[in-house]
Amino acid sequence: MGLPNKRKGGYKMSTVIEHSVLRDAFQFPLGDALFGRRSRRFSFGTSIPDGPLSFQSPRDVLPLTGLEQMMLLTATCGNTGWHYMITRHARYAPHISNYSAAAGGRTFPSAAGVHTSEVFFTNDEGVFFMETRDAPSLLGLGTDGKTDPEALVEAHRKCIRKLSDGRLHIPREEPYMLGHNTWCANVPGSLLVIPVGDVAQHEIALLCFLVQNGYCIYDDVNRLKISGLDRFRGLVDVDHPYPLTWVEQYALTEVTVELSTGCYAGMLMLQAMGLGGWMYDGIDRYTLLGTSGDPKVPGLGFRYDTDDRWALPNPTGLPGVFEGYCPPHYPNMRAAVEALARRKFGPGGPFHPDTPGPWKDTAKVRGSAQVYSEEFKECVATMAQYVYDKFGKFPGTVPSIYTHMFLQAHHLDLEFYDFHFKPGAYLETHKRHMERWHTNRQRSCDR
């Protein structure tokens, strides 16, 4: 198992079979994926000990191959080339809208192209991090102008780094996961994909959006205006502010869309490849991140804070890997605002003229965005710092770092479905998966 090894010249498809299965997966009909999608939880080596669907798998656990994992991971969070950004708003024309924070698009949408999420994943061999949110275009094209699956997989393999050995430890019991998942979640041989979003960064981006359009916020929790905003009357309407909780619900919702639609994209790829699995939220997110307070269950190892004002711990980031745009990863919220400005307008960002792109005159398009002024950044930072000071964290009413939707992939035990279900419980791709993706193993099983 594991991921493809790095070879001289990169990962190469070693057989005609690998070329063929990749092409077949890319050409799988969208309608079949949409309407053939089901949560198929019963994997090789699984057991349901009781009830009307009791069954013991006769098959040995079979981990996903490196190629299978790369296909699924690329579908879940892969780069899809340069995104087109939001192009116009009359308020600041002829400048192009400057909302986006990433220059590249991915297999899932992100509100205004902010893209704050990244993917962690675990298998039998370890815990890994796949970094694609600020990647340049990785969409390799063949001589026919179509996507080259081999080049795409190779490019994304280079985005992965290993964090630790061994499968992520999640006790298969409550309260670490919901009881109905204890028999099938994170089982040996499976791939568990864990998208994580930076809500703190997304909220800063939302505050920038508000200021760009002449708005500001007030503290509706404590029924207070934010002190210091009067000096920005030339930028924002201080007399008609938006409520803080509205903005924070907005930020959390938009981040959740990233996490969920990424999993859904991977779910569709499961159908194309003929793998079992499902997307779900039935693992405790504090257990996964490592903020449960249980030293026996360190999870991903994110640092977190607690406070008597909060009912739950607040994760802020994994140092050196995935750090939220908030203290203690930044000394104050002004520094976090500056970091977002660098991501947008600095080298590689969506509004830097030297960043490549899809337009005939990309430098002109990217360079036409209005760069944040010092006054602009100070206005955003004033609101953000108020929230941090008043609530002890940023955002004030929702988590700084968030995860709540996951994707699992495994080899499907068809015998369970043949025994308990009417015909049609799985697709032709599931029926032929072992024959197509594991030819040598299938011959051995058939003897």
What is each residue range found by the language model?
Residues 1-447:
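Acidic, surface-exposed loops and disordered segments
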